[in-house]
Amino acid sequence: MSPKTETKASVGFKAGVKDYRLTYYTPEYQTKDTDILAAFRVTPQPGVPAEEAGAAVAAESSTGTWTTVWTDGLTSLDRYKGRCYDIEPVPGEETQFIAYVAYPLDLFEEGSVTNLFTSIVGNVFGFKALRALRLEDLRIPPAYSKTFQGPPHGIQVERDKLNKYGRPLLGCTIKPKLGLSAKNYGRAVYECLRGGLDFTKDDENVNSQPFMRWRDRFVFCAEAIYKAQAETGEIKGHYLNATAGTCEEMMKRAVFARELGVPIVMHDYLTGGFTANTSLAHYCRDNGLLLHIHRAMHAVIDRQRNHGMHFRVLAKALRMSGGDHIHAGTVVGKLEGERDVTLGFVDLLRDDFIEKDRSRGIYFTQDWVSMPGVLPVASGGIHVWHMPALTEIFGDDSVLQFGGGTLGHPWGNAPGAVANRVALEACVQARNEGRDLAREGNEVIREACKWSPELAAACEIWKEIKFEFDVIDRL
């Protein structure tokens, strides 16, 4: 570089390191309707001021780096930088606070959850100045959400396809999840569907293993679906897991499912990745397939209160990336989920407009405009005694899935399905008659047992099964 060039490069530029808060902490900033807003739970290292830590998050997740660079002068940082515009303490946690960060829309590629997360959570979580960092919520503006297709079909279109209204949908995960041959797997699918379930399901890790290759499973499950439909007169489905080691293989499995004429496929969206999931969702929209989403690996990301990402953020990301169902916890079963928090992100999945409500963990008002909704799936350690609570908590627009609670019935798979269908119909009827399921639920189930021996047997076998542990994810 010539001396003349060096002089020009140094005009208005002072090398060195300066506090992030001098540039990225802007409490006077008024957020715009087009900004993406983030709420971070920040735990700074001892001696790091709250303003500096919040500004560091804004900087490292947008335009900043650890030192001043002269190329800052070649762009407009005021236009593109993230801004920490507010900081508030976390009640009961002296070392934690919530940092609110606003990101200008131009920082993100349209229609790409992958790019959104790479920017906002891709690098900053390893920052040494922070002991821990958790993304609690995102506000996605309509200007950005409209660049996504969203769910392939949505709740109303799914009900129309299935011709099922006025009640939750009923499902079952085939167990044991691994080890069955394709033919025996298909037999279990048939028995459960024949007994009265709407859906059966591959578990998240059922892909294409030596004991059951994917093509064989798809064929036997399709046979089971058609046989059960012919015998019951109801539309049935099985979530055929298309998740694979490559996107090309995943799409090949989805194409084969469509050729078989089945109504729904499945994807593990976190282990499979957002790019793969969005591609599959677009294919499902174009080809009339419903898309069931499993959240395998979510607890690695969202379980800890002070680090990672809350599931409400993953739920919003899924609604944009695309899925017609997603597992959302049960509140009453074996998996983590506090009631108010769970219902907060259930509303974020289903509703068009969700008001800010900190009592349910919703940090921002979210307007999805016309994006279709996603059915929440309650699954994990639930059985017939849970049916009143599940019906009352989740309402009609949900899928209730009983794996062990169906296949663990003492009389077999079909009677297990009958027991769950009878329990569901009894709870829906009682609710429609004005009865309080939260208070009278057990009595509703006992009354139904009088005319359903299958339900009576299920109630007897699971009458003392409870999962009573403290919930970690509290507000």
Swiss-Prot record:
The modification N-acetylproline is found at P3. The keyword Oxidoreductase applies. This is Ribulose bisphosphate carboxylase large chain. InterPro entries: RuBisCO, RuBisCo_large_chain_AS, RuBisCO_lsu_C, RuBisCO_lsu_C_sf, RuBisCO_lsu_fd_N, RuBisCO_lsu_N_sf, RuBisCO_lsuI. The active site is at K175 (proton acceptor), H294 (proton acceptor). Heterohexadecamer of 8 large chains and 8 small chains; disulfide-linked. The disulfide link is formed within the large subunit homodimers. The basic functional RuBisCO is composed of a large chain homodimer in a 'head-to-tail' conformation. In form I RuBisCO this homodimer is arranged in a barrel-like tetramer with the small subunits forming a tetrameric 'cap' on each end of the 'barrel'. GO terms for molecular function: magnesium ion binding; monooxygenase activity; ribulose-bisphosphate carboxylase activity. The gene is rbcL. Mg(2+) binds at K201, D203, E204. NCBIfam families: PRK04208.1 (NF003252).
